[in-house]
Every structure is written in structure tokens, then in C-alpha cells.
Amino acid sequence: SADHYPYGLTDEEYSELLGHEVDPVFEIYKNTLILWSADIDEPVHVDKFCSSLDVMPTLANLFGLEYDSRLIMGRDILSDEPGLVIFSNYSFITDKGRYDSTTDTFQMWDGSEPDPEYVAERLSEVQNRVAYSASILDNDYYRVVFGAS
């Protein structure tokens, strides 16, 4: 869900900058997150798919803050959970591949045929997470749970 790509560039200009044709569905949002703390002795490199939705639970974990992960769409980037990036059109990226909702296709990173059960489970998870998130916002759920302040 990164939203800081070069808006002013056309796809052609962005492709020229990248050195290859840009994929406007998935690649345009590719970004990097760098967190720094004086308390970390050795660098930690996380090489999994994540999104800006994952920053809050990651910071909550690092600061030792308690939170109910069921009420948050993102995941702690430092957890052992596989990465999951959800796009507003229900397309998504996992550690195994990517699903394009506009074509209803799942492409495995290794080029193999996707397991239909895996794809169905991930698609259901994505649809549920989006529905829960929308319901939380539509019903002002956080105010109900935590009260107005």
C-alpha cells in the first residue's frame, strides 16, 4: 500500500528509470523500509513481502506495546508469518507468488502450477481481511471497544 511512487512520471518514463517495463499493478508500489535503533547490535535484513499496513504492528512489537492483532490488517514484519501484501483491488502478493484480481490468475514465483487450494485459501483470507477492515471503519469499532476520548 505504499503511495509514494513518482506520480508525475508516465509509465514510459518510470520504465526508463527502472531500466525495464514497469508492472503498474504490482511493481509500481515496490518500496523499502529502513528502521534504525541504537539498541540493535547487528543489522536485521527481512526479505519478505510486506506493506505499509505492516509498519504499525512491527513498531508496536519493537516498543513492547500490547495490541490485538485481530483488529489490525497488517502483520509484524519481524514475525515468522509469511509476507502478505493486499492491494485495494483484491490483488495480493505472498511468498509463493502473486494473484491478479483483474485476470483472476495466480502466478507462482518459481513458474510452477499453483495449488488451487492454496490460492483459494489466500483469496478467502484477503477478502475476509478487507471485509473486516471495512466493517471496523464503517461501524467505528475502535470507539465502541476503547471508548471516546
Residue ranges of each PLM-predicted region?
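Solvent-exposed soluble domains appended to multi-pass membrane proteins
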Residues: 1-149
